[in-house]
């Protein structure tokens, strides 16, 4: 293993001024152990840490970097926008341009409101659904993560799952009292709760294809059934495409499974790697937002011109050829991983959602959060470090997606192929 002394020093320094040394928990390597790598630069599919070690990037900033890092068109757009000013607190032309780009890609979306993070997008969509329907209760699914607003942290995935938390201290009973949590991919459970509370439920929110309990795609027809049930009871359907949006296809998950939700949330890819997100949907619903309607939502940096430039440049470069390359790269990577684990005698599942996937250890298919938690997650740290020590940077959690970019090339795949046999043997030798 190459030296990580400087990363270790930087982590210790960060711990003296930042809780846990990181600004998002999964970055601390809490579930896999070892020294978090402090990244100082990235280009294409390669990361470089403070010690000068290079890694093939299979995290892609948790999804946004579909074109790879420092893509020339994105860098040029950001530099040009920054030269004109960083933030104005006033409308800018690029806000409407990015909104139009999203609307053109996702047919049910008629109006867009831009915000700063996926958490803001889902939180605001929930408030809007409640304001539009005049109802209080919301339905979410176990293992689905919709950001860290209080009402949506109950039995969530992502970092909450990684740390083994049922929710979070500080989320009061009152904040979560109107949140109903159901098992994922279970239509009868949804029908039952609507039978009891149908006229009190404002909305159902679900990840369009979950990626925060690992990749656990919806069973065929599940999202369509949610659409049918919510429509029958006058509730709204919110499809959270913060992760899948503009990654798995030009139209996100809607391009794979065209269910016409009332509201969609977006983030990650649409921001080009800078802080931006959005929610949008039917004009009848969106027009209830201030300044047209009574549902308040605002943000000092919403529609930031530099973030808009990054998002526009990314989406405009993400053409059909780019999505074909993403799919080919995901096929190639998943195939290499599967072959190595099979050769090492490790039972595994590699569920896919387009070019997103996860690696679960165990023989049983994973269709919900309970099944994800029942996998042999204790094998993951050994597998993770086997790859990391060989120059491949996978997600540092068993409950997160693996992401590819169009920048992955033969040199990167050669590095991955060389690293996998040892990592697979380490997973095979791991003990609970």
Curated annotation (Swiss-Prot):
Molecular function per GO: glutamate-1-semialdehyde 2,1-aminomutase activity; pyridoxal phosphate binding; transaminase activity
Keyword Cytoplasm in record: yes
Annotated pathway: Porphyrin-containing compound metabolism; protoporphyrin-IX biosynthesis; 5-aminolevulinate from L-glutamyl-tRNA(Glu): step 2/2
Residues where N6-(pyridoxal phosphate)lysine is found: 268
Record key words, sorted: Cytoplasm, Isomerase, Porphyrin biosynthesis, Pyridoxal phosphate
One GO CC annotation: cytoplasm
Compartments in which it is found: Cytoplasm
Cofactor(s) needed by this chain: pyridoxal 5'-phosphate
Similarity-based family: Belongs to the class-III pyridoxal-phosphate-dependent aminotransferase family. HemL subfamily.
Assembly with partners or alone: Homodimer.
Protein name: Glutamate-1-semialdehyde 2,1-aminomutase
Organism listed in the record: Mycolicibacterium vanbaalenii (strain DSM 7251 / JCM 13017 / BCRC 16820 / KCTC 9966 / NRRL B-24157 / PYR-1)
Gene name per UniProt: hemL
């Amino acid at each position: 293993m190459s030296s990580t002394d400087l990363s270790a020093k930087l982590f210790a320094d960060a711990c003296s001024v930042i809780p846990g040394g990181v600004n998002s928990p999964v970055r601390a390597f809490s579930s896999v152990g070892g020294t978090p790598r402090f990244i100082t630069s990235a280009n294409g599919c390669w990361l470089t840490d403070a010690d000068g070690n290079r890694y093939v990037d299979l995290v892609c900033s948790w999804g946004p970097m579909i074109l790879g890092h420092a893509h020339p068109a994105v860098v040029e757009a950001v530099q040009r926008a920054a030269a004109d000013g960083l933030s104005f607190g006033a409308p800018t032309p690029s806000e409407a341009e990015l909104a139009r780009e999203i609307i053109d890609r996702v047919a049910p979306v008629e109006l867009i409101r831009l915000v700063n993070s996926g958490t803001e997008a889902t939180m605001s969509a929930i408030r809007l659904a409640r304001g539009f329907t005049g109802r209080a209760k919301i339905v979410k699914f176990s293992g689905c993560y919709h950001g860290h607003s209080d009402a949506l942290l109950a039995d969530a995935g992502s970092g909450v799952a990684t740390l083994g938390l049922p929710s979070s201290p500080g989320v009061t009973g009152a904040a979560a009292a109107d949140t109903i949590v159901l098992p994922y991919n279970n239509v009868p459970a949804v029908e039952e709760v609507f039978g009891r509370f149908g006229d009190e439920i404002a909305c159902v929110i679900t990840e369009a294809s979950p990626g925060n309990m690992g990749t656990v795609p919806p069973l065929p027809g599940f999202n369509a059934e949610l659409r049918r049930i919510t429509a029958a009871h006058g509730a709204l359907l919110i499809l959270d495409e913060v992760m899948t949006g503009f990654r798995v296809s030009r139209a996100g998950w809607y391009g794979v499974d065209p269910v016409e939700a009332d509201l969609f949330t977006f983030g990650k890819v649409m921001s080009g790697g800078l802080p931006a997100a959005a929610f949008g949907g039917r004009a009848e619903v969106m027009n209830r937002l201030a300044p047209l309607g009574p549902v308040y939502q605002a943000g000092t940096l919403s529609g930031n011109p530099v973030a808009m430039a990054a998002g526009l440049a990314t989406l405009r470069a993400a053409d059909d050829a780019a999505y074909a390359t993403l799919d080919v790269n995901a096929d190639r990577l998943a195939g290499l991983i599967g072959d190595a684990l099979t050769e090492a005698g490790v039972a595994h599942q590699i569920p896919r959602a387009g070019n997103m996937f996860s690696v679960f250890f165990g023989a049983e298919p994973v269709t919900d959060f309970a099944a994800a938690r029942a996998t042999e997650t204790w094998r993951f740290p050994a597998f993770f470090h086997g790859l990391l020590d060989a120059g491949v940077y996978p997600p540092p959690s068993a409950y997160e997606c693996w992401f590819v970019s169009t920048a992955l090339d033969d040199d990167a795949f050669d590095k991955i192929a060389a690293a996998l046999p040892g990592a697979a043997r380490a997973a095979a030798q791991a003990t609970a």
